[in-house]
Amino acid sequence: PTLPKAIAILNPKQQNCNYPFKDLCGCGVGFKFISAYYIQNGLNIEETYSYLDLLALATVADIVPMIDENRIYTYYGLKKINQNPSIGLDSLIKKLSRKNNITSSDISFGIAPLINAAGRISHAKNAVKLLIETDTGKVEKYSDVLYANNQERKIIEKNILNEALKKNNKKSSTNVVSSKNWHKGVIGIVASKLIDLHYRPTIVFSEKDGF
């Protein structure tokens, strides 16, 4: 592919990039940019540590290899989550009624699905607003929206999975199912669950305009 004309393209996976660690998530790349800006301008680098909770969240949620820098960021990010999380993240944790120390598993199976539900069911901007908002009242509002989105996502997912199981051809070596009524934001999760159930290559798609 042809790279766009830009002042800079930050991607450690580029062929000519000599940055030693290639497996940062997008948020990790953003954090490196912020860190470089602070260093270049003689600012207090410790101020960037306030983002470690969000960096840990993104690193775990993106399922990047938990090695090298990713492991370090997650370790210190989880410490911040358990000691002094951002108010948006704290609001989500309370929604999940977590009382013990938050772990990477809590992010993977609790917090990340809440955040992802915004993009699946309504609009991802609601998750962004939650994470950057500083007003407690507004944070609670966005947190409620994300929680409701996730509950709706669970219901839709269950219904689609049940329908997909009925359409499944048990004799086939592959599994291809579709419907014009299936929510496009949820079918990826359903496909993963079908693979877990049948151990076969699986395609799940939502039909639109006859396709």
Descriptions of predicted regions:
Residues 38-211:
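Hydrophobic helix-and-loop "lid/oligomerization" segment in the mid-to-C-terminal part
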